[in-house]
């Protein structure tokens, strides 16, 4: 069973997350030939103060 871990900044709506998991599931099933019930998706929402790129926290980027 494919399992996807998606990390993203917090703040997206339930509708946006619903659409995301529907599309990831659809493409996975088309590509791998598996049933939708075999696809697990875990969304982890991260605060900008806990994510850095290039040594700079996203909460401090301009």
From Swiss-Prot:
Protein family (similarity comment): Belongs to the 4-oxalocrotonate tautomerase family.
Xref: SUPFAM superfamilies: Tautomerase/MIF
One Pfam family hit: Tautomerase
UniProt-annotated catalytic positions: 2
Coiled coil: none
PANTHER family in alphabetical order: 2-HYDROXYMUCONATE TAUTOMERASE (PTHR35530:SF1), TAUTOMERASE-RELATED (PTHR35530)
Its EC number(s): 5.3.2.-
Keyword match Nucleotidyltransferase: no
Record has Isomerase as a keyword: yes
NCBIfam families, alphabetized: PRK00745.1, PRK02220.1, taut
Any one GO MF annotation of this record: isomerase activity
Keywords noted in UniProt: Isomerase
Record-given protein name: Probable tautomerase RSc0807
């Amino acid at each position: 069973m494919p399992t996807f871990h998606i990390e993203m900044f917090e703040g997206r709506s339930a509708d946006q997350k619903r659409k995301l998991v529907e599309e990831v599931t659809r493409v996975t099933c088309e590509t791998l030939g598996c049933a939708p019930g075999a696809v697990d998706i875990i969304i982890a929402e991260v605060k900008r103060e806990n994510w850095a790129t290039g040594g700079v926290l996203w909460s401090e980027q301009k």
